[in-house]
């Protein structure tokens, strides 16, 4: 099958880019795949982080950077390129309505000229910080799409609220296997200057909905109930970090809560996950998260909150714990994990469970949905 994938690839950084690159590589094993990348993903004035790029990741010379998200001329150029290729299938990933005008216009140009099947892999349909025009933009894009893949029940519900007759398949987010194998825990902790025997990790972009404040509050509970532990929270901050620093100072937990406001490059991800005992996602809202598949790849258990689809891929007491988005409950779940280490083999449970999240299965679903 001849396939075109449109979206975010390296040198752009982050989970979306990682997903696209992995999808491209996996599909290329058995199909003729062309990828089209952004020349401009976000204007700098609209990007809240320090940089859009990961300098440690090289862009694939076979992937053309054509699409400028705010330049309609580039949308036409991308559509023209795809029309010339005459693919059987075009694939997009959708995570925010900002890209709906460019993606929708590309599909409109294409549909006027050739018959082509189209598929959207849905991360988010209704964004975390929604605005009144989001549904209008999403509908504009989605009306040109034939098939959808949703990776959580909450996204499934959002899709059906906009398009009750949508043709879709639900399947969980596949594992990220692009970060390499885990490394020795003691060595990784030495590199990170972590001396405590217990390490709890919060990883990824820091945004209001991700509940870092809940984890700080949970740490204030843990300091009286857990011994010899460190909480490491690392990620680029998409908001003012001062309130978090103030909370840490107020609770006098500077010695046990290590807040590092920095992006972790691709080649350093395994260092942090290898060092950790457990990964915590104290989110206040969510659809699904790419952090859980990364944790599972490194056979690390998780504590997640029961928002969106986070709890759908956690086997309670076997691969992790599901908590309400409440600081005391999050703290209790962390305590329960450490209390059960001699009773539960979390690592082996996760290894078995990971068979449900293979990329082979995900690719098979893409093939199945478009040949119906």
Where are these regions (language model features)?
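N-terminal strand-loop element at the rim of the active site
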Residues: 9-13, 19, 24-84, 98, ...
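Acidic donor-binding loop of glycosyltransferase active sites
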Residues: 271-287, 300
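Donor nucleotide-sugar binding/catalytic pocket of nucleotide-sugar-dependent glycosyltransferases
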Residues: 143-182
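Conserved donor-binding/catalytic core segment of Leloir-type glycosyltransferases
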Residues: 194-210, 216-219, 231-232
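Nucleotide-activated donor-binding/catalytic signature segment of Leloir-type glycosyltransferases, i.e.
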Residues: 66, 244-267
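Conserved acidic donor-binding segment of nucleotide-sugar-dependent glycosyltransferases
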Residues: 316-328, 336-341
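A short helix/loop element that forms part of the nucleotide-sugar donor recognition site in Leloir-type
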Residues: 180-194
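Short hydrophobic beta-strand element within catalytic cores of glycosyltransferases
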Residues: 281, 295, 301-304, 314
